């Protein structure tokens, strides 16, 4: 089984490069937490300039992908994630529902496509799905793909055979977020370990499914802990093809109600650093967009975000209305279509910046 390599925060990049050269192997430079903290500490304009340069090297800077996320099974989750209104551990007034019928999901996908989405994501609030749950979900995947939409599901932890079954159904992406850094993780979740998450990501990768993996900021973590999350993501080998960055949406009844909100510029910095450290990933502006004004959203696009979740609801929290999204993108001159990745420049640094030398 191919192991997802997570580099320790204290990795000495220069020494690692020398060892690799001596062994005749090629390996990308690894991001230390200290490197990422240094990016956070750059003057804001310098960071934005570097992020935009990186973005333009790898993508059309005036294109974003519209994604729609549908909750196909809401509430009743046995996990205790402190941010989540779907947990049975929190009294949020959310009513648990059973898995949606396949025809209703496909009808929602049809509407999403008519509204301009090119990616359809389906989320179910489970710790881990039973095998019997996956049969109708495979039908959903096949039906959505038949419409020409990119497919993504998030169902919790997976076993090896389950990941393989989803791949055989044609699944494009599996979402399983790390949520936060290893150091802060215990403050947020106790029912699932960090290694549990990494194990599921490994099974997804081994099955040949693209990885969608990001996190949430504004949970009460420090800047260094935010940097720790980015380091974990960027040092995956390979890093995720899709990186959703969520801004905490506080829901009454969850333990994080009343948490001090993250500074808006710090959120933009996080988007920019995700772009710099994972230059060829789709960086998705995800939950929390409703609490951002239009200028802040535009700044996130400038920082390198090239996908938004589009529609009136994002799982169990609200999202800017579709018409407002269309008008904003039009005013910014941004086209809503599948983002086009630029050809890889084999001679340059894969990280897309002058901070790292290209591997020898």
Swiss-Prot record:
Pathway: Cofactor biosynthesis; biotin biosynthesis; biotin from 7,8-diaminononanoate: step 2/2. [4Fe-4S] cluster binds at residues 77, 81, 84. Its cofactor is [4Fe-4S] cluster; [2Fe-2S] cluster. Residues 1-21 are annotated as: Disordered. Binds 1 [4Fe-4S] cluster. The cluster is coordinated with 3 cysteines and an exchangeable S-adenosyl-L-methionine. Binds 1 [2Fe-2S] cluster. The cluster is coordinated with 3 cysteines and 1 arginine. [2Fe-2S] cluster binds at residues 121, 152, 212, 284. Residues 62-289 form the Radical SAM core domain. Homodimer. Catalyzes the conversion of dethiobiotin (DTB) to biotin by the insertion of a sulfur atom into dethiobiotin via a radical-based mechanism. This is Biotin synthase. It comes from Paraburkholderia xenovorans (strain LB400). The lineage of its organism: Bacteria, Pseudomonadati, Pseudomonadota, Betaproteobacteria, Burkholderiales.
